[in-house]
Amino acid sequence: MQTELASQPETWTRAAQLAAGNSTALPAAGERVAIVGCGTSWFMGQAYAALREQSGQGETDAFAASEFPAGRPYDRVIALTRSGTTTEVLELLGHLRGRVRTSAITADPRTPVMEAADDLVVLDFADERSVVQTRFATTALTLLRAHLGLHTEEAVADARTALAEPLPENLVACSQFTFLGRGWTVGLANEAALKMREASLSWTEAYPAMEYRHGPISVTTSGTATWMFGQAPEGLAEQVRGTGAQWVGGTLDPLAELVRAQRLAVAVADARGLDPDSPRHLTRSVILPSA
């Protein structure tokens, strides 16, 4: 996992270059789009959907593949699937065949998704051995950001900074973690929380930042770390610090902040004697038996 974490600046650069050559496999401006996935891929889809709508390129929804609204019309459905074998994704693509244009973004084209989708974008250079996703997720989102014209070299530089700088002091010792986001970074907050749960078995939550005051702040204690992706709502940092919790304000590109959160998940796992590459009860892909 450490090697995969460290390679993200390079895989982001390659993905951004790849975006220009895959214009037909990715949504055109004005298309009504849904993006689907499971776990990490769903959360990257949430971030992309918000980014695409904010940039004025068309209505975009994100769904867990198992919760796709079958009767809702779209011009294109994008499936994010690292393995290309996830049952819910393949079943949905099969259901949609001939009804709507589908695109899949995957790390392995030698899998059933190659035949299941109409168009394919392969990020094999971002594939991973670890069960826990890190670089494939951020590389796929970089591809999509670049296709929207929103990728910058500063994001890559910030990723290098996120890998090089020490984590905030005393963060590893916290007993509870909360990640907050606004707009497209809500998806990143959800993903950061999932990384902490998977890799370090930590009690971790995620919310839209403005929702934190509406109940969740009640569990905040001196053992809590509250981490904000992007600009915080006015007064929230002070309110969180007032509970005794540790506040972490993101200063880097939000996707680079996710890299910092990935590092935190590994550090907490190491401190607890856990193997972050092979979390309990998890496999690299969820393949369900046929009905």
Regions found by a protein language model. Give the residues of each.
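An N-terminal, well-structured beta->alpha segment
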Residues: 1-31
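A general structural motif
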Residues: 157-166, 204-214, 230-231
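YjeF_N-associated NAD(P)HX repair module
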Residues: 7-10, 18-19, 135-176, 270-291
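Anionic-ligand anchoring segments at beta-strand to alpha-helix junctions in alpha/beta enzyme folds, i.e.
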Residues: 18, 26-76, 175-221, 263-266, ...
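Glycine-rich phosphate-binding loops that contact phosphosugars or nucleotide phosphates
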Residues: 29-157, 163-164, 182, 225-251
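Phosphate-moiety recognition in structured ligand-binding domains
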Residues: 1, 117, 231-232, 239-291
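A cross-family phosphate/adenosyl-ligand binding-site feature
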Residues: 1-10, 124-136, 254-258, 278-279
